[in-house]
């Protein structure tokens, strides 16, 4: 009798299941643990208090990213609390024998950029980090998700995690993406379709022609924002693109170990006939460049659209929520998206801070000038991304056009470092969240692709990137 067809998620889960209790609570083995300065201090302190060691320091990688300034790092950190967290991570990594990339190491960068970059992220592995956007690593066919600080301590101490199994959802995007439509638009469209709670209780597997056609950078963008759709994690079955990306990376397997790993990785795909608890299908050809208008990632609209009118919403709770969002964003129903002017622009983050993203922005920026009313910053996702961009001359294109070229870090994605919006400043951002205050107190965030962000910085307002050239 043939084995029951299983999903990619099921396969990885089953390969890592240590124990399952009668109530469905499971103990899962964790292959990789990424650590940063914000969610780890209490976890390490818990280990010290209990007299425990890190169970598998070689399976743990630490980097500083959330709090580091992206300007001159030879100067002291202006925020004492941030400086304390950074110093604590350095001390904890040293005391517990963990590899650590500090702010002066060219390998330093946003944790979800450096994991794949170093080959620490591998197909078929379980990966956790005290950060919600750990789902990024699912682009390589890894089961990756964020955990809380107490769970960080548990993984450090035991290399296991207590979990309950999620359900399976497959999101299939077939067809060819039109010019000007990117991975960022794909995932924003998916979130717009299912809402920020639509993926709750699920692990999403992304499939279809349009997903397979994406580069690894594009796939990371899609998986990165799975959490904004409410999902536990996002997955894409690994293929030749993933293997090519990883081969030769510093921490990837070498020689015979690579060959053995590859044989396993090639089994990592959902079987024909595998059961998914929910299915969603999208037509890639119908997707436009997208801009968010409100204070939730589900508040999406085509760049050719107009700010929606909450009065058209029948559900009272939802109507009141959208009215609040419009008031916070300072927008009037019926306003053309292309008439919305911006004050700031941010290209970077674990969503869109990779070399492909910077190339797309540079293509838009070349020979142009940033609008006099816009402050625009570009923050590479890692020191190695920065190094590559500079080798390609992208930094010169940006600087000549009037963009600020910064050091790597999380930067303006979140208001935990000096890069913040002032109250009521409006920002075109390539990050992943547009919540109230996310980029600074009373700051107004519109999520877009790198090309759309660069074009808005130059025009001073949102434009349809399809008309740019």
From Swiss-Prot:
GO molecular function terms noted in the UniProt entry: 3-isopropylmalate dehydratase activity; 4 iron, 4 sulfur cluster binding; metal ion binding
Cofactor comment text: Binds 1 [4Fe-4S] cluster per subunit.
InterPro entries listed in its UniProt record: 3-IsopropMal_deHydase_lsu, Acnase/IPM_dHydase_lsu_aba_1/3, Acoase/IPM_deHydtase_lsu_aba, Aconitase_4Fe-4S_BS, Aconitase_4Fe-4S_dom, IPM_dehydratase_rel_enz, IPMI_cat
Superkingdom per UniProt: Bacteria
Keyword Iron-sulfur: yes
Pathway recorded for this protein: Amino-acid biosynthesis; L-leucine biosynthesis; L-leucine from 3-methyl-2-oxobutanoate: step 2/4
One Gene Ontology term from the biological process aspect of the record: L-leucine biosynthetic process
Database matches in Pfam families: Aconitase
Enzyme Commission code(s) on record: 4.2.1.33
Binding-site list for [4Fe-4S] cluster: 350, 410, 413
Intrachain S-S bonds: none
Class of the enzyme per the UniProt entry, highest EC level: lyase
Essential cofactor(s): [4Fe-4S] cluster
Function: Catalyzes the isomerization between 2-isopropylmalate and 3-isopropylmalate, via the formation of 2-isopropylmaleate.
Family: Belongs to the aconitase/IPM isomerase family. LeuC type 1 subfamily.
Name of the protein in its database record: 3-isopropylmalate dehydratase large subunit
Gene name as annotated: leuC
């Amino acid at each position: 009798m043939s084995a029951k067809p299983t999903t990619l998620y099921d396969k990885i889960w089953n390969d890592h299941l240590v124990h399952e209790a009668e109530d469905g609570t499971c103990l899962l083995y964790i292959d990789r643990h990424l650590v940063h300065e914000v969610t780890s201090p209490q976890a390490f302190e818990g280990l010290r208090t209990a007299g425990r060691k890190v169970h598998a320091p070689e399976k743990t990688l630490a980097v500083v990213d959330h709090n580091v300034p992206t300007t001159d790092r030879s100067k002291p950190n202006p925020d004492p609390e941030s400086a304390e967290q950074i110093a604590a991570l350095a001390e904890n990594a040293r005391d517990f024998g963990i590899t650590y990339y500090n702010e002066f190491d060219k390998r330093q960068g946003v944790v979800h950029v450096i994991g794949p970059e170093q080959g620490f992220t591998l197909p078929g592995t379980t990966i956790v980090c005290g950060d919600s956007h750990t789902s990024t690593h699912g682009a390589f066919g890894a089961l990756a998700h964020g955990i809380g600080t107490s769970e960080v301590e548990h993984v450090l101490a035991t290399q296991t995690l207590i979990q309950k199994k999620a359900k399976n959802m497959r999101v299939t995007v077939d067809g060819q993406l039109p010019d000007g439509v990117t991975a960022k638009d794909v995932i924003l469209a998916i979130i717009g379709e299912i809402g920020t709670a639509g993926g709750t209780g699920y692990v999403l597997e992304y499939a279809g022609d349009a997903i397979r056609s994406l580069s690894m950078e594009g796939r990371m963008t899609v998986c990165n924002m799975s959490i904004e759709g409410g999902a536990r994690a996002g997955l894409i079955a690994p293929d030749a693109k993933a293997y090519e990306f990883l081969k030769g990376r510093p921490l990837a397997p070498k020689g015979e170990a690579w060959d053995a790993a590859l044989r396993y990785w090639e089994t990592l795909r959902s079987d024909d006939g595998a059961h998914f608890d929910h299915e969603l299908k999208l037509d890639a050809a119908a997707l436009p460049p997208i801009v968010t208008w409100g204070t939730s990632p589900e508040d999406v609209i085509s760049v050719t659209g107009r700010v929606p009118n909450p009065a058209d919403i029948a559900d009272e709770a939802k109507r009141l929520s959208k009215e609040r969002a419009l008031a916070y964003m300072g927008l009037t129903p019926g306003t053309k998206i292309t008439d919305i002017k911006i004050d700031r622009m941010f290209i970077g983050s674990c969503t869109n801070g990779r070399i492909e993203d910077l190339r797309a922005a540079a293509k838009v920026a070349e020979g142009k000038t940033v609008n006099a009313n816009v402050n625009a910053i570009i923050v590479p996702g890692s020191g190695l991304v920065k190094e590559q961009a500079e080798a390609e001359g992208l930094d010169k294109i940006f600087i000549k056009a009037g963009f600020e070229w910064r050091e790597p870090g999380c930067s303006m994605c979140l208001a935990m470092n000096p890069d913040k919006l002032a109250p009521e400043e409006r920002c075109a951002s390539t990050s992943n969240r547009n919540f109230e205050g996310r980029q600074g107190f009373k700051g107004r965030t519109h999520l877009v692709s790198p090309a759309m962000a660069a074009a808005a910085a130059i025009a001073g307002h949102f434009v349809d990137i399809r008309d740019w050239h």
